[in-house]
Regions:
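Histidine/acidic-rich helix-loop-helix segments that form or flank divalent-metal centers
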Residues: 40-58, 111-168
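Histidine-centered, transition-metal-coordinating active-site segments
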Residues: 10, 14, 95, 112-113, ...
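Glycine- and charge-enriched loop/helix tracts that form the active or gating conduit
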Residues: 1-71, 75-93, 97-111, 204, ...
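Short glycine-/small-residue-rich flexible loop motifs, especially phosphate/cofactor-binding loops
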Residues: 18-19, 103, 120, 152, ...
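Charged substrate- and nucleic-acid-binding regions of tRNA-handling and nucleotidyl-transfer enzymes
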Residues: 104-108, 161-218
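Non-catalytic alpha-helical coupling and interface elements of nucleotide-dependent molecular machines
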Residues: 10, 26, 80, 128, ...
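A glycine-rich phosphate-binding loop feature that marks nucleotide/adenosyl-phosphate handling sites
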Residues: 23, 35-38, 74, 118-126, ...
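Alpha-helical scaffolding flanking metal-ion-dependent phosphate/phosphodiester catalytic sites
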Residues: 63-66, 71-78, 137-185
Length: 218
C-alpha cells in the first residue's frame, strides 16, 4: 500500500486523483473522509478541508515526506472545529491533533521510523509563527535541524498557496525567511548542535552528566 501511495502522491495529476477518488483513498486512510466537504467557515480559506489538502499537496515538490505531510497536516481539523461569536471557524490545537493522528496512520502503513518522525514533526510545526529574525530562525533551526527547517518553510508556503487568494501574501514572508537563512549560513554561525566545536563526549570528560550535557550544549 505504501509504495502505491507514494507513487500516487508524487505522480502527475495527484490533485485531480485526490479530488476524484477520495472514497477510494478513504479505504486506506479513513481518517480523511470526514474532511471531505467540511467547510472551514473562515475568511482565510476558500476550500473545504479536503479540497484545501489536495491543493496543498499539489503545491509542494513531489518528495514523499513533503507530500505525506501536506496530505495529513490538517487531518485533525474536524475534531478541533469551533465557531466564534462572529461565525468564524477555528481549529485550535489542530497541529497537535493532526500530528497524533498522522503518527498512527504512518505506523499503520509501516513507514520507516525516521520518515514517520519527520512527517509528524513537520505537521506539529506547520502552524507555528516563526519570527522573521535571526533569533527566530536560529531557534527553529536548533529545534529542527537545517533539513527539516527548510522542509517546514516549503510546507508553510504550500499551505498558504492553498488558501484564499487574498491571503497568499504570506508566501512572501517564507521567501524572505529562506533568504535570511541563507545569509546566516553564509556567515557560518553555529545554528545547530552538530556545528559546535565540542560534543557530548567532550563535556563528559569534563565531568558533566545526564541532562546537564544536553542543556549545556544548547
Amino acid at each position: 500500500i505504501l509504495v502505491e501511495m507514494n507513487k500516487l502522491l508524487c505522480g502527475q495529476r495527484c490533485k485531480e486523483v485526490l479530488l476524484d477518488y477520495s472514497d477510494v483513498l478513504g479505504i486506506f486512510i479513513p481518517e480523511l473522509l470526514p474532511c471531505v466537504g467540511f467547510s472551514q467557515q473562515n475568511v482565510h480559506h476558500c476550500y473545504d478541508i479536503y479540497t484545501h489538502t489536495a491543493y496543498a499537496v499539489d503545491a509542494i515538490r513531489p518528495e514523499p515526506i513533503l507530500r505525506w505531510t501536506m496530505l495529513l497536516h490538517d487531518i485533525g481539523k474536524v475534531n478541533t472545529f469551533t465557531v466564534d461569536s462572529r461565525g468564524q471557524g477555528h481549529f485550535y490545537g489542530h497541529p497537535r491533533v493532526s500530528g497524533d493522528m498522522a503518527e498512527e496512520i504512518c505506523a499503520r502503513l509501516r513507514m520507516r521510523k525516521r520518515d514517520r518522525e519527520d512527517i509528524v514533526t513537520l505537521i506539529r510545526w506547520h502552524d507555528k509563527n516563526i519570527p522573521l529574525t535571526e533569533k527566530g530562525i536560529g531557534t527553529a533551526m536548533l529545534a529542527l535541524g537545517e533539513e527539516n527547517f527548510r522542509r517546514l518553510l516549503e510546507v508553510k508556503r504550500a499551505d498558504n498557496l492553498a488558501q484564499a487568494p487574498e491571503y497568499r501574501w504570506v508566501a512572501e514572508k517564507i521567501d524572505a525567511a529562506e533568504k535570511l537563512l541563507d545569509e546566516m549560513l553564509r556567515r557560518e554561525p553555529c545554528l545547530q548542535l552538530k556545528d559546535l566545536a565540542v560534543n557530548g563526549n567532550d563535556l563528559l570528560a569534563l565531568g558533566y552528566s545526564g541532562r546537564e550535557i544536553g542543556l549545556t550544549l544548547q
